[in-house]
């Protein structure tokens, strides 16, 4: 069961295993939910817009087969923590993320701020850098040249790790966003579940491909399983062939 709050966020009040069926039910049920929020409960344009942003944020995460929905929130593997922070910043939606053992819990009913997400991203990226740099001969205390080189590297890492702004284009216009989401939710209910799921995936892939993912398409695809387009040259990034061509 899906619950809308007055703040415009989406909640789930039962325990579910993430599955094709759940994805299809939530996606196809969203238009009716939005209609009821507007006509029956009198949600205004701003609240509807926040609902759509929340839906745009949480829907791809529901396609992650390695997680589940619980009464405390959306549970995903801990190694996806970094990508979830990036995705929240891109969408402009910032539910609290709690680390519990080997999982993270996205607490959909506990909103935080973009500043909190940026701070956590900086902490995670800095910790990763320090762990990778441990034991290197050109550490921070080796000499001034090494110190400056490491400082520049860390600053560049931090700058790259944070999206500059929320999703633009489609997200910038209320009517466009709502219409596009409703169109993406359309699917024939009289066809098998697998076909419904594939059709919805293609519809939403087109929708997300219109958004500015700020160079994070590969991370988004790894996090959500959505078939987001990646420029062909990006597949060579860091590969042996790329290094050979650069020499």
UniProtKB/Swiss-Prot annotation:
GO terms for biological process: symbiont-mediated suppression of host innate immune response; viral process. Residues 76-95 form the F-box-like domain. Keywords: Host-virus interaction, Inhibition of host innate immune response by virus, Suppressor of RNA silencing, Viral immunoevasion. Changing residue 140 to A: Almost complete loss of systemic RNA silencing suppressor activity. Belongs to the polerovirus P0 protein family. The F-box-like domain is required for suppression of host RNA silencing. This is Suppressor of silencing P0.
